[in-house]
Structure formats: C-alpha cells, structure tokens
Amino acid sequence: MLLPKRVKYRREHRGKMRGRAKGGTEVHFGEFGIQALEASWITNRQIEAARIAMTRYMKRGGKVWIKIFPSKPYTAKPLEVRMGSGKGAPEGWVAVVKPGKVLFEISGVSEEVAREALRLASHKLPIKTKFVKREEIGGESNES
C-alpha cells in the first residue's frame, strides 16, 4: 500500500477542498485514464483496491500508472473517548483529489479492455469519475 517514507509532521489540518485541480488534468503517460468529477479524500486502501481490480481484469497485460499519492495523514480518536485531550492518533493516509484530476492511466490494451478495467476501478472509489483518452494534436500524440 502507498504511504510516505517520512513526514515532517505526524498530524495535519483537514484543509478545504475548494476549486478544481491545478495540475494532472490530462492523460500524459498512458492512452486512457479516469478523471475525477468530484472532490474527495481517497485512502491508500481505496487506491490499492482500484489498482488490483484493474490489473486482474487486464490479466497482467498493459501498464498502469497511479497519478495520485496519499501524502496527507488523517487522525481518529478511539471509540468512547471524551472530547478534548488533544488531537487523535494518525489513523491512515489519504490523497486529496479535486475535480479534473486524472487518477489512473492505462496503456498497452485495447480501448474496450481499458474502458472496462477503469470502470471496475471506479467502483472502488468514493467519487464519480469519467473515462478520458489522450488528446491528439494535429494527428499525432502530444508526446515529445
């Protein structure tokens, strides 16, 4: 599962999820991808479940890129504990996803296989997504 090797601070503020994604809004590495339509926290377990669903459907064919990383810690207090006495212990890691962000990319498989694999992956995620293709510019790909 994905998690940072080391962090400067063990606990972070929750923050706001306003606006659209600044970067990572286009398919760069693969041919097909899924793009977030809503803002949400996506946990490292959800990312891993989506990755497994895709690779199992593709039967180890093709290549998968994970474009998000869970770098934000979230905390939780134990059950039946009174309020106060500080912030809770770190519980897990999340990736902050805003609308427009490409989450996963796939290449090396047909469009039908990619569409189904990404559909299965999207069912593991807590947000609405859409299937996107690499944009062609003047008849050739935007790879340089």
Swiss-Prot record:
It comes from the Bacteria. One of its GO terms (cellular component) is cytosolic large ribosomal subunit. The keyword rRNA-binding applies. InterPro entries: Ribosomal_uL16, Ribosomal_uL16_bact-type, Ribosomal_uL16_CS, Ribosomal_uL16_dom, Ribosomal_uL16_sf. GO terms for molecular function: rRNA binding; structural constituent of ribosome; tRNA binding. Pfam families: Ribosomal_L16. One of its GO terms (biological process) is translation. Keywords: Ribonucleoprotein, Ribosomal protein, RNA-binding, rRNA-binding, tRNA-binding. Binds 23S rRNA and is also seen to make contacts with the A and possibly P site tRNAs. Belongs to the universal ribosomal protein uL16 family. Part of the 50S ribosomal subunit. HAMAP family: Ribosomal_uL16 (MF_01342). This is Large ribosomal subunit protein uL16. It comes from Bacillus subtilis (strain 168).
